[in-house]
Design a protein with these regions (language model features):
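Short polar catalytic/cofactor-binding loops
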Residues: 12-17
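Short, solvent-exposed loop/turn segments at secondary-structure boundaries
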Residues: 19-23, 124-125
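Cys-nucleophile CN-hydrolase/nitrilase-fold catalytic domain and related Cys-dependent amidase chemistry
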Residues: 20, 28-106
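Short, acidic/polar
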Residues: 22-31, 154-161
Length: 166
């Protein structure tokens, strides 16, 4: 049951293409500017690398596992600032690459979902594998869909999932 509004902050950072260190530094530097009453901070798609497609091995070099440095940092920041953080990163499962959404809660709970509708005009489908699950997170009484960018154009299935999340 929803008991209060959810205060959401968007983080429209300048993305340095393929430059994880600069993108992570920007996030760390600007975190103190986020309003302290924020409940959820939403980062851009592939916030740590920029939207990268093209050569699969080049993309793989930028990828991480769910237990990599990027997610470890997001967990640390969510705990430190007391709000959930959502976004996406390039995930490597040891074989396939995914544009993977994350939702990290201040208590360390984590949820991951892979982008389902890959953007063929940017050749995303040639590099990344498609996700299959439609996931929603229950956070502070709200059902929040785990979708990435182009997935938003296909909301029917997302709406069904949100309505059925308890």
């Amino acid at each position: 049951m929803i008991t209060k509004p959810l205060k959401v902050a968007l983080f429209p950072q300048e993305i340095f293409w393929k430059d994880k260190a600069s993108n992570i530094d920007t996030l760390i530097r600007l975190m103190p500017t986020i309003h302290p009453e924020t409940d959820l901070l939403i980062l851009p798609e592939m916030f740590s690398t920029g939207f990268v497609t093209g050569d699969k091995e080049e993309v793989r070099a930028l990828a991480e596992r769910n237990t990599g440095k990027t997610i470890d940092l997001i967990k640390e920041l969510a705990s430190q600032y007391g709000f959930a953080i959502a976004g996406s990163f390039i995930a490597d499962t040891g074989g396939s690459l995914y544009n993977r959404a994350f939702f990290i809660e201040p208590n360390g709970d984590e949820t991951f979902a892979d982008k389902k509708h890959l953007f063929t005009m940017a050749k995303e489908d040639r590099v990344f594998s498609r996700g299959h699950d439609r996931l929603a997170v229950r956070y502070r009484g709200w059902n929040i869909a785990m979708i990435v960018c182009y997935d938003i154009r296909f909301l029917y299935g997302v709406a069904i999932k949100i309505m059925n999340t308890t």
